[in-house]
Amino acid sequence: MARRDPEAESKDLNWKEFEAFVESAFLSFGYKTERNARLRKPRAEIDLIATKTGLAFAVDCKHWKRTIGYSGMLAISNRQMVRASRLVGERSMRVIPLVVTLHDESLRILENGVPIVPIHKISDFILNWENSSDDISVLSPQVME
């Protein structure tokens, strides 16, 4: 049986279908999901929230045709960190900010603790993120107070 190539499959998807593709990966591992979650005051949106056992991934899905480099990705991840922090406050649960990209940005975990995961590695990340948990930002209600 041939292995599926998530990157090749994702290239022809539009951004909305890409979000659904990322969501399907989390669903396949038993996560409950919510797409396009809106935050208020100030208004913001999280592409995907994937929740399991008191932990949520706040996922920003980036279906860009090219890579953007370190400084661009750091700016994007910082904004996702802010949205994830707000989610902690609204839902009182631990939250991991995450950026999923179409292409491999050759970055793993940025200095702010936000993982950058190319779509072809999303399943492996979901299964094994705890192996890198010392480097990953896990925002919790106790820390946010």
Annotate the PLM regions.
Residues 1-46, 50-145:
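Intrinsically disordered, low-complexity Ser/Thr/Pro/Gly-rich regulatory segments
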